[in-house]
Amino acid sequence: MKYIIVIWTLLSSVSVFAQTVVLRWESNSGTGQITVVNGELEKIKSKGGKIQKDRFDLSSAANKELWLTVGKARNEIGPKATVVNVLMDNEKSFSFFLRDVSSEYPIYIPDYGVTVLPEGDNRSYTQVEHDVLSRKRLTKIEKIEEEPEMSFQSAALSVRKMNVPIWLGLGRDIRIFEVEDELETNSLECKALRPRYSGTPVTLPESNNQGVFYRYAIGRGVGVRNNVKRSLEEGVLPIYHSEMRDDDIKYHSITFASLSGAELSEENVVGTDYFISDKYSPGRVFTNEQKVILEKKLANQLMDMQEVVLCSKTCAENVGNVPRYAWLKTPQPGDGNWKYVFDVNTGFSAFSKDRVFCVSKVNDKPIPNEEMAVLLQPGEKVDFEFYLFHTPVTWEKAEMLADVSFDSKYRECKSYWKSKLDRAAQIEVPENRINNMIKSGLLHLDLITFGQQPNGPLAANVGIYSPIGTESAPIMQFYMSMGWEDEAKRALTYFLETQQENGLIANYSGYMVETGAVLWSIGEYYRYTKDKKWLMEIMPKIKKSCNYLIDWRNNNKKEELKGRGYGMIDGKVADPEDNFHQFMLNGYAYMGLSRIGEVLKSLNIIEADFYRKEADNWKKDIRSSLIVSMSLSPVVPLGDGTWCPTAPPWAEGNGPRALYQDLGTFWSHGTFTIADGLLGPLYLIYCEILEPSEAIAKMLYHYHSELFYQGNSGFSQPYYSTHNWYQAKMGLTKPFLNTYYTTMAATADRETYSFWEHLYKMTPHKTHEEANFLMDTRRMLYMENKDTLEIFKVIPRNWLEDGKKISLHNVRSYFGELEVSAVSSISSGVIEANVECHSDKMPICVKIRLPHPENKVPTKVEGGCYDEKRETVIIKPFDGKSVVRLTF
């Protein structure tokens, strides 16, 4: 008897018995087919419909319902669960996990007008709809819409707080310093200084060819208080300020990078050859031919370049009313066991006579000991300075620098970085943090854009990594937006110079997505600049890459791939080794080819029509595979009780990878959601395969927001998700601001504004993340929509409180240079805005959103037609200059 019980238990655990469910449609469902995965379709039944094997026709049936009986069903948790595919001839196909069918939470798909219920549940579609909607549940996005607009202050209270090591350098030159204080968020016992060549730590014979680092200290030590405050010069320049309060002694430090033997100026910064910077930037994969070029460049690199030095000055001040001691420690190499000498007469620290690594002074004289205690009277100060060389120098070079004034180097550095900002467009918004992040962000990007001056390719690095076609794109496009067209062009040239002979652009770690992404950025550059001369110069390389993509696509035009990747290229798009027909990969390839077709048409080049036609056909094939993939992908529940169709990240998939329909282990980079949420089908909207307003685009957005976001922000590396681009395009202000502030507050250092790559603090100074934040800011302020310029579409409402002003001076767009301003005089009942655009590519229409801070509707509108729902003034036709005035 006990064996019978065991057998019965085993059989029950794998659900081998038949299960019947009923599908009920709202209206005419038409014809279709039923297939079952991991189970067997035993029977289809209908009242008045026509059934033939696995096909059905409910066109003439009075009741639009279908009973399905599935045998050998697998309804236990885990992979290989039974999935029912309802394949409609009207493209409203869907699939569902059989185990998800229940009466309490019925599968109700309003987009397709259908519900799925267990046998015995006799509710009609209308009754199910009423039962679900009467519960008045909300999706995550609907909840956001009911809440106040998100602000940085609100977001900062609920998300991770990040402290990021700061990078200091010159820009163009790969010699940089990483500086880190002993904070509560790290495990340092004192301050750390790490010289780097781009993303690679400097190694020395004295460090046993391991990454060299130095430690120094001020104050009595690490205590119970979190007493370090950090900032940038004027809130924006890459000059690091650190203030520590140790009871009555206040230590204020200023640290920056400079040249040791020359004035810091753009003329004196030689820069580093992009091939050499790539050698020191992890991820770069050189072809055999490129390795030969690299070896030649390394052999010929200049050995007499100016030394790069880290300049630091700490002023210790007694702010108490009795005498107090201040403590100082000069930079020491390694963990205390490295061999070196300190010269008490000069304040030099050296590995040997001709290997000086640091010059230290106190009150402008050589420091007499490596560690000091100085008694300060109330109000008295002591200055502790040091110059740390990027790599050790001769005694003579150290002596030369010892006589240099710190203050003169400080003035040079400020002037150097300010001159760069002066060449850029100016943006001012009524939120100081955002103002600072725009300016500091541009300089952070510039700091690790490497290359020789004054001309030639620039490597737009992304943190420690070499340039990547996708990740460098927002960097180059923000350069374009801020008027740094030359930097953008030189950064694009990098990818063309590293193009392989067959046209493939694939520099980073086997990423196959770069070719399309680079072509897209070239197309964007042309939209901004109409630089016909340069485009004609690089046209052979452009065509070579386009033809490479087309040949690659043609190799995938196989009958067995119809609907599952036909005409779609295959390969990985990021670190995971997912070499499939990925939607992201093909989206970028299509967008790149489409942009080049547009460029060629403008230049009257004969291949224009061919490339446009190829791009259009590629788009059709991608859409066909997407529709098939979605039909086979299980629906998922949303927060409002409805269910939504989903899509896999690649054409051969059967659903979101995170649902684990199949056996496998895919967790990576701190999350289960990479393939779906960060690299998945939402890119088809971003890459213009789908229009944002399409129903299918909205479905993708809806289930992504429920499954793959926390606080409306992605996991691990949230700036890889394109949903905030979608929210901006759709004018979803509250969701946009929720993502904008939540992601920024959780990813960026709140004092120095540098970004981590990942939320688990992997790789600092990640400029791909920072550039995406900057481009989000740009889109918040202005963006193009075909022949229309949209201004302030998703700005915070409180930016137009009384007395506040928004100003965009000389920003760049597809329509040329823009001058935009808005001034709120709510106390006088007025908001006024000005828009100017004087170019031969002006927009036909301008839409400017001016939301009243208290949601009021204007009583009078001057300067255009008013769209009350969108709080937007529409100016059409636009003649180059408009003044809009709202009276409340």
What spans do the regions from the language model cover?
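Bacterial Sec-dependent N-terminal signal peptides
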Residues: M1-T20
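Terminal accessory carbohydrate-recognition/targeting modules of carbohydrate-active enzymes
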Residues: Q19-V429, T788-F888
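Low-complexity, Ser/Thr/Pro/Gly-enriched N-terminal "stalk/linker" regions
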Residues: K143, M244-D247, E380, V393-E396, ...
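The feature captures the catalytic groove of carbohydrate-active enzymes
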Residues: G261, M303-M305, V309, P368-F406, ...
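Active-site acid/base region of carbohydrate-active enzymes
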Residues: D422-H444, G469-T470, Q500, V513, ...
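Acidic/His metal-coordination segments adjacent to aromatic residues that form catalytic metal sites
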Residues: G451-P454, E497-Y508, G565-Q582, Y660, ...
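Active-site core of glycosidic bond-cleaving carbohydrate-active enzymes
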Residues: S466-W484, K489-N502, T515, P540-K543, ...
